[in-house]
Amino acid sequence: MQYRVDPKSGNRISALGLGCMRFPGAPGRPDAKTADAIISRAVEQGINYLDTAYLYPGNEACVGASLERLGLRDQVLLATKLPHASCKCAEDFDRFFDEQLRRLRTDHIDYYLMHNITSPAQWERVVALGIEDWIAHQKAAGRIRQIGFSYHGSAADFLTMLDAYDWDFCQIQYNYAGERYQAGTAGLMAAAERGLAVFVMEPLLGGRLAGKLPPRARAVFDDVRDPYLKTPAAWGLSWVWNHPQVTMLLSGMTDTAQVDENAALADRALPDSMTATQLDTIARVLGEFEKSNRVPCTGCGYCMPCPKGINIPGCFGAYNASYAHSWFTGLSQYFTASAVRTSEPKLVSNCIKCGKCARHCPQHIDIPERLDDVRRRFQPGPVTAAFKAFCKTRSS
């Protein structure tokens, strides 16, 4: 395993970190046996950084129990996040943090983040509640070792956040399709210049730069036949690791095979190691990808549940597939997401435009507006009637 140094703490952090949010299982109940297998294999492969959050249903408790069963807590750097938007008074900081320690079965958090900062105003609000004194107290007591924030706002606001506090690290979304999106390359460079460790999330854009890559984009990679970069995932992860400013990237690995594949890649993907030919290949793939990337949804599920039962990520995935593959492919996926698994169709036309989903979207997608695009593409009158007839027939 390749390790990179956190400039603030001196910690040697594996270039590949384990994002635990996507552990398989029922909603809110990650499968314990699978979690044990993934975490155990990750540590065997040299991964020493695990990321979870209060707002990932059931995830902190799953990770904590797994680390205790496996006896691995002392071998990893554990990261979780404060749901700052739910903090209404200073006492809430302790209330959430103490609950997180209990869930994770630990007496300290190695890397603690303000979760999903989208504007400096969010930080200013908790500063007014006294969070700076609270952080200082927790760090002095050894219960928080490093403090940082995860970010999903504009590039300009990211620079403001960097200077708003004496941060130890930050976590940004970064991939070859997002150099000018959110913090972007400019933000990565600015954070590194300030001496912060920079952790990367969504290096494969929720899988859209890996297994879900459009065929025409994948064909560019296939034609190159690189002896080391044999999959779209390998290309995407290597592109992120090619930046020396990146301390570590998180991958939401869902089985041990993914752990093995990504760990092997992390051994070779050194900073500034990609050739001009490889970087040109990435640029050509990006050109093809952007032709079909109509809605930048990563499938994170923060928008769910919808009060009308609409499968928002599934609908956006179908919409993009209709451009990446064919209209009929997209329609089939939309049918599966909206009708096959329900007793009555949960069509995008059911949207009441309450806006609840959009308020939670890290990508700042105007979800009600984009669902209208999905409706126009997939719901001409005969199709809508067919959906409803199918559900009625099945339930009778």
Regions from the PLM with identified roles:
Residues 1-76:
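N-terminal binding-site loop/beta-alpha segment at the start of enzyme catalytic domains
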Residues 6, 18, 35, 42, ...:
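Conserved, mostly hydrophobic/aromatic
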Residues 19, 53-56, 112-115, 150, ...:
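Conserved residues at the C-terminal ends of beta-strands
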Residues 26-27, 40, 44, 87-204, ...:
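Glycine/proline-rich, positively charged
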Residues 47-48, 67, 166, 186-396:
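Structured C-terminal cap/extension of enzyme domains
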Residues 48-54, 145-149, 171-172, 248-250, ...:
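Short catalytic-loop micro-motif centered on adjacent basic/acidic residues
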Residues 61-80, 132-141, 193:
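Alpha-helix-loop-beta-strand connector modules within alpha/beta enzyme cores
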Residues 74-86, 112-115:
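A short, structured active-site edge motif that brings together acidic residues
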